[in-house]
Amino acid sequence: MTDLYIGMMSGTSLDGVDAVLVRFDDAGRPEPQADHVVPYPDAVKQAVLALQPRGHDELHRAQTLANRLAEIYAQAARELLQKSGRRAEDIRAIACHGQTVRHAPHDGYTVQIGNMAKLAELAGIDVIADFRSRDVAAGGHGAPLVPAFQQGAFSSPDEKRVILNIGGISNIARLHAGQEAIGFDCGPGNMLMDAWCLRHTGQPFDEDGNWAAGGAVHPPLLAAMLAEPYLTQPPPKSTGRDLFDDEWLAGKLGALPSAPPPRDVQATLLAFSARGIADAILEHCPGNQAVYVCGGGARNGALMAEIARQLPGQRVAAIEALGLPAQLIEAIAFAWLGWRFDRRQAGNLPSVTGAQGPRVLGALYPR
C-alpha cells in the first residue's frame, strides 16, 4: 500500500483550497512532498457565504455548490500531481475536509459540503471525507480536530507549548508534558478583519496588519465585543460564522453612540482577536512557555506582535520553527486523519472535542 496522501483543507477564511502531498512513515510522522493552492473564484466564495444563514432553496444551492467545489478540489489534486511528478495511481487517498457551511453540534450536526463521489470520479483516487460527523454523533463538537495531529507532531518533554492556529477562527492546542491535551476555538481569528478590510479597502485581507496598525483601538467597541458570552464558556467548545458574522459585528457597532472610523474598527478587531487568544492561553494553559502559530494569521505581523505583547514571558513564533510550514498545517492534519482512517485508528481527542470516546473519523468514497 502506498503511503502517499493528498490532504485538502478549505477553511472559514474562504480564500481557497490548500492541497498538500504527504508521505507518512510507520509512526505517522509527515514528510510533505509538494503543495498547491487553488483560490476560490469570487462567485464560489459568495455562494458559500450565502449558505451560512438559513434561507430559501438551501438544498438545491448547497448541492450545486458541492458539485462546483468537487471540480475545484479535483483541479487542486490534478495540478498538485503535475507539480510533484506523481500519478493518480501513486496516491493512496485524498483526505478532503470539504467546506463548512453550517456548524451546529448542539443540534447534533455539522455540514461540510463538496460532492466527494464526484471528486473520486474526477480525480480517479479514493476520497476520505466527512471527518467531523462521527465525533458529533459521539456527543462531541466535531472540532477542533487538528490538535490530535499536533499532539503527535509537536509535543515536547522539555517545553510547555501551545499550538495556535489563526484561520478565520482561532483555536489552540495545549501540549504540556504530563497533562492531558486540550484544545478549543478561542473566537475570531482573521474572519472579521478580512471581511471589514474587503468592505472598506477592496482588499481581501489586511497585508501584515498595516491598515489596522494605522488605526486606534476604540475601547467601547472592544469592551462590547469582549462581552460576548462565548469567550467565557468553558471548553470543550467550537464556533464559526454561525456566531461571528457580519451581523454580529453590525450589532456591536449599531449599539455605539457614533461609528468609529473604519481604520479604528480594524485596529479594534485585531485587538479583539489577539485578546481572545491571549485570554484563552492565560486561563487554560498556566505555565505555558511558547506559542507556535500556524494559519494565515502567522503572516500578520501586527497581530503576532499584539499577541506577544499580551503574553509577556512567552515565546511567540511561527510554527516553521518546529519544521513544518504554517500555511499547510491543517491540510497536513487532514492527510494524517486519512492515514488514520485507513488503519481504522481514532482521529479525535475526546479531551478536546468532548466526544464520549475515541472514534475513527471519516467516510470512504472509492475511486
From Swiss-Prot:
GO function terms (MF aspect): ATP binding; kinase activity; phosphotransferase activity, alcohol group as acceptor
Q: Which GO terms describe its biological process?
A: 1,6-anhydro-N-acetyl-beta-muramic acid catabolic process; amino sugar metabolic process; peptidoglycan turnover
Record key words, sorted: ATP-binding, Carbohydrate metabolism, Kinase, Nucleotide-binding, Transferase
Give the Pfam families listed for this entry. AnmK (PF03702)
Query: Known InterPro entries for this protein?
Result: Anhydro_N_Ac-Mur_kinase, ATPase_NBD
Q: Which residues bind ATP?
A: G11, T12, S13, L14, D15, G16, V17, D18
Which pathway is this protein assigned to? Amino-sugar metabolism; 1,6-anhydro-N-acetylmuramate degradation; Cell wall biogenesis; peptidoglycan recycling
Q: Kindly state which reaction or reactions the protein catalyses.
A: 1,6-anhydro-N-acetyl-beta-muramate + ATP + H2O = N-acetyl-D-muramate 6-phosphate + ADP + H(+)
Q: Which residues form the signal peptide?
A: none
Give the enzyme's EC designation. 2.7.1.170
* Protein family according to the UniProt entry: Belongs to the anhydro-N-acetylmuramic acid kinase family.
Return the NCBIfam families for the record: PRK09585.1-3
Write out the function statement from the record.
Catalyzes the specific phosphorylation of 1,6-anhydro-N-acetylmuramic acid (anhMurNAc) with the simultaneous cleavage of the 1,6-anhydro ring, generating MurNAc-6-P. Is required for the utilization of anhMurNAc either imported from the medium or derived from its own cell wall murein, and thus plays a role in cell wall recycling.
Name the HAMAP family on file: AnhMurNAc_kinase
Name of the featured protein: Anhydro-N-acetylmuramic acid kinase
> From which source organism is this entry?
Chromobacterium violaceum (strain ATCC 12472 / DSM 30191 / JCM 1249 / CCUG 213 / NBRC 12614 / NCIMB 9131 / NCTC 9757 / MK)
